[in-house]
């Protein structure tokens, strides 16, 4: 059951869904839908995204399922990524809240954030996986000083030039490494983005 559809971003639409188990329990999930330009891109993106199912880290959002679906209304293929849902929002909302209240994020929280994100990035980089879209809205807040990386992007979809241009025009360019404007991604791109996010946190 779909509970909510969030405003679409340059690289997809995010849904909040609820699944009822046989025992009657209700679990919330986030589902990201990304449009694919053709069947080949969908296959490549799905193959890339399967690596996300193998990630098991306390500071990385758990991916539950991946599938490709056809939307008759727009006659297009969509890659769907089902992931863990955090009821506490994301880092972007936390930063905005602090700014509205003219409050600072405590140094201890910032230090824990940095340690958790460095550890999470080191974990994915060892497996030759890059995040490619690291920014505050893609970092989930799971506790007072607990955070999770979320919303990874696949290379196949990030190289869709039309979506890329839209993304560059949005605020996310504030966290993008210089080389990513030329469609190049490495582990250094993620580190650059993390530094920008850290600066954003400290400038509340």
Regions found by a protein language model. Name each.
Residues 113-114:
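Activation segment signature within eukaryotic-like protein kinase domains
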Residues 62-77:
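Short beta-strand micro-motifs within the conserved protein kinase catalytic domain, predominantly
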Residues 190:
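Conserved catalytic-loop aspartate of Hanks-type protein kinases
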Residues 125-141:
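Catalytic-loop of the protein kinase fold
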Residues 13-36:
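Glycine-rich ATP phosphate-binding loop
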């Amino acid at each position: 059951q779909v509970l909510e559809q969030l405003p679409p971003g340059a690289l997809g639409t995010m849904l909040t869904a609820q699944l009822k188990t046989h025992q009657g329990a209700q679990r919330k999930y986030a589902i990201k839908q990304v449009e694919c330009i053709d069947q080949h891109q969908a296959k490549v993106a799905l193959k890339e995204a399967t690596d996300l199912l193998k990630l098991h880290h306390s500071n990385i959002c758990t991916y539950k399922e991946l599938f490709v679906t056809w939307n008759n209304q727009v006659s297009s293929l969509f890659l769907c990524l089902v992931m863990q849902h955090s009821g506490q929002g994301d880092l972007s909302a936390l930063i905005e809240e602090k700014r509205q209240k003219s409050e600072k994020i405590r140094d201890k929280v910032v230090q824990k954030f940095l340690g958790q994100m460095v550890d999470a990035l080191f974990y994915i980089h060892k497996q030759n996986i890059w995040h490619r879209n690291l920014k505050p809205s893609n970092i989930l807040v799971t506790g007072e000083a607990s955070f999770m990386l979320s919303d990874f992007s696949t290379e196949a979809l990030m190289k869709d030039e039309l979506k890329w241009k839209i993304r560059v025009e949005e605020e996310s360019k504030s966290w993008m490494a210089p080389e990513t404007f030329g469609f190049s991604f490495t582990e250094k791109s993620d580190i650059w983005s993390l530094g920008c996010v850290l600066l954003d946190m400290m400038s509340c």
